[in-house]
């Protein structure tokens, strides 16, 4: 790297720092219908299966992964 590299990089990023960043206008309304108990149970169960089942599989087979590697 040359001596001028930091100066060139500072020149490139300096102009980007002065640009205004537009803020998003996000508005939300109350839900039209409340969720029922069954819908909540299905949602929580699907999240549980999606995230915790693969992690549990990996943790339960960790010894076999260690022996293989």
Curated annotation (Swiss-Prot):
InterPro entries: Cyt_c_oxidase_su8, Cyt_c_oxidase_su8_sf. CDD domains: Cyt_c_Oxidase_VIII. One of its GO terms (biological process) is mitochondrial electron transport, cytochrome c to oxygen. Keywords: Membrane, Mitochondrion, Mitochondrion inner membrane, Transit peptide, Transmembrane, Transmembrane helix, Ubl conjugation. A motif (SIFI-degron) lies at residues 2-19. Belongs to the cytochrome c oxidase VIII family. Residues 1-25 form a transit peptide. Disulfide bonds: none annotated. In response to mitochondrial stress, the precursor protein is ubiquitinated by the SIFI complex in the cytoplasm before mitochondrial import, leading to its degradation. Within the SIFI complex, UBR4 initiates ubiquitin chain that are further elongated or branched by KCMF1. The chain crosses the membrane at residues 37-60. GO terms for cellular component: mitochondrial inner membrane; respiratory chain complex IV. This is Cytochrome c oxidase subunit 8A, mitochondrial. Component of the cytochrome c oxidase (complex IV, CIV), a multisubunit enzyme composed of 14 subunits. The complex is composed of a catalytic core of 3 subunits MT-CO1, MT-CO2 and MT-CO3, encoded in the mitochondrial DNA, and 11 supernumerary subunits COX4I, COX5A, COX5B, COX6A, COX6B, COX6C, COX7A, COX7B, COX7C, COX8 and NDUFA4, which are encoded in the nuclear genome. It comes from the Eukaryota. Pathway: Energy metabolism; oxidative phosphorylation. Residues 61-69 are mitochondrial intermembrane. Component of the cytochrome c oxidase, the last enzyme in the mitochondrial electron transport chain which drives oxidative phosphorylation. The respiratory chain contains 3 multisubunit complexes succinate dehydrogenase (complex II, CII), ubiquinol-cytochrome c oxidoreductase (cytochrome b-c1 complex, complex III, CIII) and cytochrome c oxidase (complex IV, CIV), that cooperate to transfer electrons derived from NADH and succinate to molecular oxygen, creating an electrochemical gradient over the inner membrane that drives transmembrane transport and the ATP synthase. Pfam families: COX8 (PF02285). Residues 26-36 are mitochondrial matrix. The keyword Transit peptide applies. It comes from Saimiri sciureus.
């Amino acid at each position: 790297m040359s001596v001028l590299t930091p100066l060139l990089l500072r020149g490139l990023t300096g102009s980007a720092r002065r640009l205004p960043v537009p803020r998003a206008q996000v508005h939300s309304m109350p839900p039209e219908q409340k969720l029922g108990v069954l819908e909540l149970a299905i949602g929580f169960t699907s999240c549980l299966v999606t995230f915790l089942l693969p992690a549990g599989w990996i943790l339960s087979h960790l010894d076999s992964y260690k022996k293989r590697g």
